[in-house]
Amino acid sequence: TVKHVELVFPLKLGVEGVKVLQPVDSLKKSPNLALRTRKDTVADIQRMVVDVQLLPLFEKQVMVDELNFTKMKVNTTNFIHEARIKGDVGNLRLKAHGIDLGKEHVNVNNALLSDAKLSVELSDTVPPDTTPSSNFWKIKIQRLKLKNTDFTLHMPGDTLQVNAYFGDALARTAYLDLYKGLYQVGHLDWQNGRVNYDQNFVRPVSGMDFNHLALANMALKADSFYFCDSKIDAKIREACFREKSGL
């Protein structure tokens, strides 16, 4: 549903009050008729501005000169294989010259994510869905800026939780394969950050506790980052922080 549409100078499309809903597959055959019609909110966007080139669309190519979301709630539901991303975004702005609808490839030139709080739930932390996954999208991001953004990652079974805050960060040459759950970053410069790492089923102990880490005042530079199939690999070139134990 859309509340209001307007033309933004010079030839951009402004849209307000956008809501995207999706039926809940697991409730379609429920004996409760009220539950059968229940829907998940995939996106609730206060305002968005769109500037897309027209001619490439005829060849299934999308050239986005500007895509700007303001005050957005998101929930990917079952769109991403064995994962769910949900939360609030203050502002998401991007330029993407090279979206191939046929090959399911996306090239993002520049992107900014600010004032966001997002949760990423992996594997069996996501309720099972009977719909086969058909999301084979691959996304390349040349330059991604993060400001005042909070991420929480829940590992399978919620055994491990990692929270990261990006006060000011710049990532270059990022690559995402949404079907494989593969996430790579070529270079990361992270300032004004913090990280909390918790093994949820291990009791905390006093002093240095490697099962419950809390790193503050973080600055980090990494030449590569890799995450796939619960495996994390990073090449850190420079890092400084303060741990809650005093380290």
Predicted regions and their residues:
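Terminal hydrophobic membrane-targeting helix
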Residues: 1-108, 115, 141, 171-183, ...
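Conserved N-terminal beta-sheet scaffold of ABC transporter nucleotide-binding domains
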Residues: 17, 148, 166
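Short acidic, Gly/Pro-enriched loop/turn segments at secondary-structure junctions
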Residues: 56-58, 75-83, 100, 119-130, ...
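Residue-level detector of the transmembrane beta-barrel scaffold of outer-membrane proteins
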Residues: 66, 110, 233-235
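Short, surface-exposed polybasic-and-hydrophobic patches located at secondary-structure transitions
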Residues: 86-89, 93, 127-135, 158-175, ...
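Solvent-exposed beta-strand/coil patches in large extracellular/periplasmic or lumenal scaffold regions
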Residues: 130-159, 216-240, 244
